Structure formats: C-alpha cells, structure tokens
Amino acid sequence: MVQNYRMRFWKFCCLLAGASVVAPAWADHAYALWGQPKYPQGFAHFDYVNPQAPKGGELRLVSNLRTSTFDKYNPFTIKGSAPAYLSDLLFDSLLAGSMDETATGYGLLAEDVQVAADGLSASFRLRREARFHNGKPVLAQDVKHSFDTLVGPFTSPAYKTLLAEVAGVDVLDDRTVRYRFK
C-alpha cells in the first residue's frame, strides 16, 4: 500500500510539471491527490494572493546557487548553465499548484483535466485564451512537442526520469491532449 501512495505522489508531481496524473474519471478544473480541491471553478485568486497589490516596478532575483552566471537560455539541455529561475519565469504548465493545499493542481494552461477511471490516462483541455508571447494560441500539438522535447536525446536525463511513467502523449484535437501512463 505504501508503494501505491508513493507512486501516486510521484505521478502527481509529474502532473504539476505538466506531465501526468492518477485519479477517478471526471473532468474538473482541478485535481486533488487527497480530498477535494479547496477552490471552486472560476475562482478569482488564491486566498494568499492580494489582488489589490501594487502593480509595476522591478523584480530582482538573486540566485542562492554558487554560480550566478549563465551561458545558455535553454534550461532543458544537458550542456551549459541556464539563468536561475528561467523555467519559472518563461514557461507555464498545464496545472499550477496551490501553496495552501497539499498535492492539488489547478488548471493553468489547461481549462480542465479528465482522468480515466483506471488511472492509465489523463486528458487536458487547453484554455482558449492560452497564448504564446507573440499572441499565437497554445495548441495540443505544442504540448506534445514539449513532452517529446523533454524525453528527447538532447535533454537532461533528469526530465526523462521525471517523465518515466508517461508512456506517451496523444493529440485528440486542437485543444485536447491525453497523457498515457505505464
């Protein structure tokens, strides 16, 4: 039984990275590994976020790593050092975690998630308003391309390990992608 929970936890971690999930079958705005999501569909902001916070200004991030220099902008390749926090600032995932809940993910790029009853697949429907920096819509094929890149030959083995339980990704239509699990 402990192994089952451990495996479910790691699959959930993949989900928050935009990769995978395990649960009963229904489409919902969020997925909770334990219990029900705290926030309802369409919630405006997390409770710990101040929507009236001042906007604008300058953000300075200081890396706590020994090295603060970089020689590449692709954080996924093996060779070189990427700037600190680059992945967090440039890339979005299908789901985003909540800081006031344990193991719960809410749709970020995904409008909803539907998990198969057998736990062997999860389908994500992308938000129509999900866009790249140039205004082009994020499509299911883009999500599949991201997965294929992360498990490809030029990517750090850490991503292949993280995604080892994912058998593959299928594009169901322009806005729907399905992750299949081993």
Where do the language-model regions lie?
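Bacterial N-terminal signal peptides that target proteins for export
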Residues: 2-14
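Surface-exposed binding/hinge segments that line
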Residues: 125, 160-182
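Short basic (Lys/Arg) and small-residue
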Residues: 130
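Cleavable N-terminal signal peptides
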Residues: 15-16, 25
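N-terminal lobe/hinge region of extracytoplasmic solute-binding protein
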Residues: 27-118, 148, 155
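N-terminal cofactor/phosphate-binding cores enriched in small/glycine residues
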Residues: 88, 118, 122-124, 143
